[in-house]
Amino acid sequence: MKKIFILFTVLILSGCASLFEGPDCRYTEANLKKVSKSELAAVIGFADGSSEITSENKEILHQVAKKALNEKAKVVVYGHASHRTRTQNILQRIFINLKISNERAVKTAATLISYGVEATDINTLALFDSRPIRVEVDGAAEAANRRAEIYLYWLE
């Protein structure tokens, strides 16, 4: 299931509407069939409305970067947001959460790059509040959903 999720993520990031359109997508398809393994390397949390990387999370990302470099892994960073915003307008909520989840993914990737991971080895995807890991019935659940997930994957 993780390989399929990574496959579709890379397709989305490469701008491919399907596996069979255009030469760039054929190249992507050929490479994606060579993904041999993927794993969740880390999940880092964020304060409400923030995309700042804490010192604790910097250390976690430093360890992820070391592993990616030592094992020649590629990286996908998924940015997430909690559902709650200060607006009831659904389009504004989506826009706000898309923006913050993108900032979280990009800043996480930038931190990995600062630790030596090549920018060309990292993809980011903003998932706004579309994939909560907890139902938001309290502040702890909201906090759990404000996160970035960092996956490593290896090509054969």
Language model regions located:
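A generic structural signal for alpha->beta connector loops
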Residues: 13, 72, 119-121
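Short glycine/serine/threonine-biased micro-segments
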Residues: 13, 77, 124
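Extracellular/periplasmic catalytic domains that process cell-envelope and extracellular macromolecules
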Residues: 36-38, 68-70, 141-144
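Acidic/histidine-rich, surface-exposed loop or edge segments in extracytoplasmic proteins
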Residues: 37-48, 89
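Periplasmic peptidoglycan-binding/anchoring modules of Gram-negative envelope and division proteins
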Residues: 46-85, 109, 113, 150
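Periplasmic OmpA-like peptidoglycan-binding domain that tethers envelope proteins to the cell wall
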Residues: 83-156
